A protein has these predicted regions:
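N-terminal beta-alpha lobe that positions the nucleotide/phosphoryl donor
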Residues: 1-123
């Protein structure tokens, strides 16, 4: 699930709670502004590909949207080869914990532990 917008849709379909935001990739700055108005600020523009905090920009008010949208999209394309971005509600000071689980076709499953990712390079 390297495409985060597609992963969001899959999680919603599976009943997993997700932050309010766009249903997929954004088509325009205007669409980002409309969604931000609907869900409230602050929001974050995020690259659909990649990770490590690249292609992400926090937007605290409408006057910041145009620059944030363009910068996130350009950075995403430069870093990952894909300019697509989406928007979601921004959480101040969240914790990012990942759990790694592997399974095979025979039903064998192994839990590799958890990882505290809140100290990643950005956001």
């Amino acid at each position: 699930m390297g495409d985060k917008a597609r992963a969001r849709r899959a999680m919603k379909k599976a009943g997993v709670p997700v932050l309010p935001g766009s249903e997929g990739t954004l088509d325009s700055e205007e669409q980002a502004l409309k969604i931000a108005q609907d869900i409230g600020y602050p929001v974050i523009i995020k690259a659909t590909a990649g990770g490590g905090g690249r292609g992400m920009r926090v937007v605290r008010n409408p006057s910041e949207m145009s620059r944030a949208y363009r910068t996130a999209s350009r950075e995403a394309e430069a870093a990952f080869g894909v300019p697509d971005v989406y928007v979601e509600k921004y959480l101040e000071n969240p914790r990012h914990i990942e759990f790694q689980i592997l399974g095979d076709h025979a039903g064998h499953v192994v839990h590799l532990g958890e990882r505290e990712c809140s100290i990643q390079r950005r956001h």
